[in-house]
Every structure is written in structure tokens, then in C-alpha cells.
Amino acid sequence: MPSKVSSDKKKNAVIKCDSVYKIFGDNAKKMLQKSNGNVDAKEFQDAGCVVGVNSASFEVYEGEMLVVMGLSGSGKSTLLRCISRLTDTTAGNIYIDGKDLLALSDKELINLRRNKMGMVFQSFALLPHKTVLENIAFPLQVKGNSTKDSMNRALEMAKLVGLDGRENYFPRQLSGGQQQRVGIARSLAVEPDIWFLDEPFSALDPLIRKEMQDEFLRLQGVLNKTILFVTHDFDEALRLADRIAIMKDGIIEQIDTPANIVLNPATEYVAKFTREVPREKVLNCESVMDEIGDLADSDMSQLRVSKDAIIETVCEAVLSEQKPVAVVDKNDKVVGALHCSKVIHMLFGSK
């Protein structure tokens, strides 16, 4: 499961977007001014403009993985490109560690990308004439690092992503999953604080995609990066995210934790994604537990489960108990009780 973002880290917004718009078309700025920020995608389309991002405001906290999810054309990749300034916004403000991204000079922007941002895209974009090691070392050499230092760092990254033994292979000798590992290692070689990933696994076969998701979660557990991850796959979003932002027609329909989105979809559009989601695979014990109330220790089972544990991982153990199970926090303090009836209802109540 994704890492949990502490309340302390939530105070530190690494990325902040304030009323960001991206509208394509010759009359984009004029149309936006005329609309006074109340953008109607159909009206803009009739005027020859395409709305990519419509008044996006949110923050991404230190160490958080925010997954931006939506169907094709929803604006999710455009939003990522605005935040990395691969695409210029039409209006709004973007801040990276409190600095105004849109006010940076070209030199400052290049320096920011080289030292603070790592990017991975659906296309592996490996250099075919370079080996695994040379591909990983390439951004370090562009920065001006020595060949020796670059190669030593590349060796570390190759080992980190499970490519040790294949350092001297060329891209054509690797599978799709292995090629994407090279792309991931290359993006991490510069030790970025912020990691942008735009549908990095969507071109892979389902089994390889699952393997890469597992690897990605392992890496995040080790590196604790601030991540903006784009996908069109709701299951992938649920599996990876600390929070999910669901987009439609350039608008963020809802931004919340996976559990809250499944339990409390904000719009009918969001609800369509959540209807078929098995609740036990998403919800944790905290989201379905009851208060202790008048329950005494003798009324409780000896079994204890973490409040962060996903129901699917503990349901068998909970259902084997005759008494309510204590739900505990990271300090082993009892914060609630999980009743068998709640778990049974979650598993079978809507079937």
C-alpha cells in the first residue's frame, strides 16, 4: 500500500496550484478574460478553443503520492505538463517549494528540472545506441558530472530497480518492463525531490504492469519522493495513491483519499468509477470500525489489527473471532472496535 503522509508533512506543500487554466487556441486568453473564469468547455470549443485544465487548485505534500486519474482527454497529462512547465499555463499560479514556477527564468527553470524534478513517461525514450548503464548515467553527464561519478551512480540505480547483471545490455535486448525500469532509474539518478510519472505502465502487459506497480511501491517506500502520478486506470490509482484527483473535461471533480472517494463520491461521474470497486480491497479498518463505547477488555478479542490495515488483509482473521477485534494505532493504542458483522456486510451485503 502507499505510504501514509503524516500531519507534519501535510504542513509542507511541495507543489501548490492556484486556479490554473490551460486553454488551447488563438483566442484562449481573450476568451478566458471574457468568461471571468467561468469556463464552459462547449462554448470555448465553439469558439475554436480546447479546454485542457479548468481552474485547478490543490496542493501536493512532502512525501505524498497524488494520483491524477481520468479518461482520455480529461486533462490529466496537460495538468502534469503545466506543473513541470513543459506546457505554459493560460492563467493561474504554480508554486514549487513556495517559489513561483511561472516567474522563473529559462536558466532557473533548467536548473530546477535538472536538480529537483524527475520525469517518466509512457514512452521509454531510451537511447538505442547506449547501454543500460549509459542511459541511466546520461542525465548526470548532461549536468556536467564526471564519467566515473556518473557511472558509479548509474550502477547504484540499476541495482535499486533490479537491473544488476544487465548493465551492459542495449535497450533492444530488454523486455518492456525492463526498459521502463531503465527509464525509472534514469529519472532517479539525479536524486529529484519531485517525481512526475505520466502513465508509465500503461503500455505494459497486465502481469508486467502489476509487477512494476509493486516495484514502484517498493521504491517509494525506500525513497519517499513527492509524486504526481497520472493514470487512466482507476484500479491502479486506488492501489498506488495517498490521494486521488479525478478529472473530467479539465475539471478536478474530486480530490481525496481512495477510501473517501469510494465511500463518498462527490459527483455522479466519480460514482461511476467506484460502483464496481470491491470495498474490502480499498477501505482500511479505521474507515469501518466502531467506537469502543462501553466495551470492556473482556468483551474484546485478543486479536489486534492496525487501523491502517486494508480489510481484505485481515478479514479472515477477524471473521474467525467470536468477539469484536481491537483496532490500534501505530503506538498500539486501541482506537476502535471492528465487528464481524461489519466485515460480513462489506463482503456480502451488496451482492
Residue map of PLM features:
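Conserved ABC ATPase "signature" region
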Residues: 16, 33-42, 99-100, 141, ...
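Helix-to-loop junction immediately C-terminal to a conserved catalytic motif
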Residues: 84
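Conserved ABC transporter NBD signature motif
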Residues: 92-100
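Conserved ABC ATPase signature
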Residues: 170-174, 178
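A short, proline-enriched helix->beta-strand linker immediately N-terminal to the Walker B motif
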Residues: 189-193
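Conserved ABC ATPase "signature" C-loop
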Residues: 249-250
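ABC ATPase "signature
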Residues: 255-256, 264, 337
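The conserved cystathionine-beta-synthase
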Residues: 298-323, 327-330, 338-351
